[in-house]
Amino acid sequence: LRRQRQMCIRDRNITRCMNNLEQELKCTLFLRSNKGIALTPEGRQLYEHVALAFEQLSIGEEEIRQNGELEHGLVSIGASENALRLILLEKLELFREQYPHVRLRLFNHSTPQAVQALKNYAVDFAIVTTPISIRKPLQKKSLLRYREILACGSKYKDLATAPISIHELQDLPFVGLAEGTSTREMYMNYFMENRVSFHPDIEAATTDQVLPMIVHNLGIGFYPEPLAREVINDGKIFALQLKEPLPQREVCLVTNSSTAMSTAVKKAIEFIV
């Protein structure tokens, strides 16, 4: 009895909505008879549009459901080279193992470029190395702390036998990153604080280019200690013991609080942090 009452209420509501729609459109949409209801030409015309809209709505609902279950999706990341190698690749490997249908789009940026891309909504978030300068609505979270070393090749290995001052290295050729990177900015400040001029004899576009230049004795240069361990153990490069301590660096997650994150982006960040 209760179910019959609910059906009667529902049918009355549907009839009321149909009548209201006809009054609003000022035309007859339904032909009512003892045999049931049929559509008028105007009713068929409206139905074609409504059916298409309903189909698109159903497709949208299914896409949102799949996004929620991470059956597909897209995550765009701006990453500096060192951040990519120090932490991001390992985290993304784990993420892809669990969510293989989510597409990843990686942009290899310097830290300033990655931050600018985030400001411009070109990426969902950025993984970069310090130093970094941001303002709201951007926010950062430290993921990893590390230090760099001053390294040399076999030609200069005698310099690595005892602590040495940066002042004693002024006449040696330096390999460094080009201007416009956070690494170059950091070392410009480091040398300035120690009252030493810093003008690299060879400028590299990426950190990956710095290491082989050091190995082949084109100059001495700074390199992330975690990434240098293997080549140090192989005897290809040597770490100098500087009397003036190098600044500590961090790998940071930078997000933009002014934009909403998709389920895929939120899940990717969970894996990274």
Where in this protein do the model-derived segments appear?
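Flexible hinge/capping segments at coil-to-helix
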Residues: 137-174
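Alpha-helical linker/hinge and terminal dimerization helices associated
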Residues: 24-25, 46-68
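Secondary-structure junction motif
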Residues: 158, 173-194, 261-265, 269
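Single conserved hydrophobic/aromatic residue that forms the stacking wall/gate
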Residues: 1-5, 9
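Hydrophobic hinge/microswitch elements
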Residues: 110-123, 129, 182-240
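A short LG(V/I)-centered, amphipathic sequence patch enriched
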Residues: 20-39
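Central regulatory/effector-binding core of bacterial HTH transcription factors
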Residues: 72-135, 204
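A late-sequence structural motif
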Residues: 87, 238-273
